[in-house]
Structure formats: C-alpha cells, structure tokens
Design a protein with these regions (language model features):
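Active-site helical microenvironments for divalent-metal-assisted chemistry
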Residues: 2-308
C-alpha cells in the first residue's frame, strides 16, 4: 500500500452523515446454515441450500411479522418472468439468486419494500425491464431501491487508488440516501461469494479483494457483524486458500459449538446458584479471517491465540 494511504477500514471509520437512520437490523439468522450442515461447520464452509419461492414464503410466515405479500408476490412473478430461461454459471436457474438475496434481506429483519427490491435487484441491469416499468408496478420507493442497487453494481474498482477515493465516496453517498440500498447490495454480494466457486479463478480473486476492502468494512459499519465475518472468511478462502484451510482445520480440532454450549450452560447454572437470575451468556467462535489477521498482525501462531 502506498505511503499516506489509509486502509479501507480507516476510511469507513471517518465520520459520515447518514441522512436516514440505520434501520434496526437483526443479525441472528443472516448467515444461518442449512439444516443438513455438518456439526461445527462455519458459514463460510457450507454451500447454502437453494432458496425456492415456497421456502421464502415459509420463512416470511415463520418470521411472525406483517409483510405486504401482494407486493412481494408481484415482485417475484415479475422477476421470475424476466429471468426465465437464464441460468447462473453454476447451472442453477437465475431466479435462485434473487430469491436467496431476498431471504437474506428477510433474515436481517428488513421491510416489504426491501424484500421486493431484493427480488427485482437485477431486472433493470440484466433484462429489458426498465425503471419506469418498476415505478408503474410498485411505486417510486421500490424502484429507487432497485435503481440504487443497480448503480452500486456498476461501480468498478480497478486499482487501490480508485478504491480509496472516488468510488468509495460514491458508495458512501448512495448509502447516505437510503441505507436499505446498501443492505440489499451486501446480501447480493454475500450470496455471490457463497456461490463464487463457479467463477474463473481470476474473477474469484478480484471479487474477493473487492469484498474484503469495500463490502466487509461497510457491513462492519452497519453493525451486521456476522455478514461482515462471512464476507471476510469467504474472501480469504479465495485469496489464500492454503491459509484458510489450515486455520479451518485447526478450529475443527479445537472445542466447537457443542463444547461452548455446554460451558455456557454450566456458567448460567452457577450464576443462578449465586442468586443472579436472567443472565444470558453469549458465545461465538472467532471467524477464520479474524484468527488469520491476528496471526499476521501480531506474529503469533494459532496456539498462541486464546480468544477463539
């Protein structure tokens, strides 16, 4: 990195005025694993299940929140028709991608307009559908969300100077107008990184670097920490597959989630015995990239890191 340049994280920590407050974002299920995932697996190690329209509807119902199903269904129908006959590089029908993005947006607790926009986020860029068509069908709010995501998608990061200057400002500007645009884009990038094995090797590395330098810091700024960590882990998997696999293997050999749950139960029981009621013990396994970064920056071996 050239002298005088700040890392992307520092740029994002600068004071930026958001014209709209950041919505309350849930981080509980944003990177939930499929039911058949191996025990102790990290989100970055498991290929996500394919989200169907039926599964999305079930998830909406299970959320217990009141959503505008008429709008969401209409958005799905339009997207399904617009992407009909198109497949992703992985071979899946293209509609699987907007459905997966919509599910991630739902899991983050976003509103009906955000879910509809997630379903529609690629139709203006990739199909004959126009912004005017969306405005007529869904109103200006949904159309503007889709337009915002489309504009972010068109931003290119060809070198580190651009990354830290003009394009970064454009991203922050889009974020300040309506933060929902950025949340949809983060979910779009997360699903693309989950399915990035189908990309050519150079594209995987380029997307991973862009994700690490741009999208993960934004997720961190918005407080969506599990999305941030999965973006970092999946990026590391493409940028340094050997380092990723080494840490992943060592983590699997250490105490996993089952052990943490058992220890948490013991602590909660001891607290109750001491007269402390209602205490909640929170636990998490440190991300692969978090461990990787610590070993590099602090020049420590895996066995010297104790906060895993």
């Amino acid at each position: 990195m050239p002298e005088g340049k700040k890392p992307a994280e520092d740029l994002y920590s600068a004071k930026t005025h958001l014209h709209q407050p950041v919505p309350e974002v849930s981080t509980v299920n944003a990177t939930a694993l499929p039911a058949d995932a191996p025990e102790g697996a990290l989100p970055s190690e498991v290929r996500p299940e394919i989200v169907t329209w039926e599964k999305l509807c079930e998830a909406i119902k299970a959320s217990g929140k009141a959503y505008n199903m008429e709008m969401i269904t209409k958005a799905y129908d339009l997207a399904n028709k617009a992407h009909n006959g198109v497949c992703r590089r992985s071979g899946e029908p293209y509609i699987c991608h907007p459905l997966a993005v919509a599910r991630l947006v739902l899991d983050l607790g976003m509103d009906s307009e955000s879910i509809a926009a997630a379903l529609l986020h690629d139709v203006v860029e990739d199909t004959p559908t126009t912004l005017e068509d969306l405005t007529a069908a869904f109103g200006e709010e949904v159309a503007l969300l889709v337009d915002g995501v489309t504009k972010l998608t068109k931003i290119q990061f060809s070198n580190i100077e651009e990354l830290q200057a003009e394009n970064l400002r454009k991203m922050l500007l889009a974020m300040s107008r309506d933060v929902r645009v950025m949340i949809i884009k983060l979910c779009d990038r997360l699903h693309n990184m989950r399915t990035g094995d189908a990309w050519p090797e150079q594209k995987r590395r380029d997307k991973a670097r862009e994700t690490m330098e741009v999208y993960a810091p934004i997720a961190n700024r918005l407080g969506i920490l599990n999305v941030k960590e999965e973006l970092e882990d999946r990026s590391l998997h493409y940028l340094d597959p050997v380092g990723y696999e080494e840490i992943s293997k060592m983590l699997s050999e250490r105490a996993g989630e089952e052990f943490l749950a058992r220890v948490s139960g013991v602590i909660e029981q001891r607290l109750k015995e001491s007269g402390i009621e209602g205490a909640t013990i929170k636990r998490r396994v440190k991300s692969i990239y978090g461990i990787y970064r610590k070993t590099i920056m602090q020049n420590k071996s895996f066995d010297e890191i104790y906060d895993i």
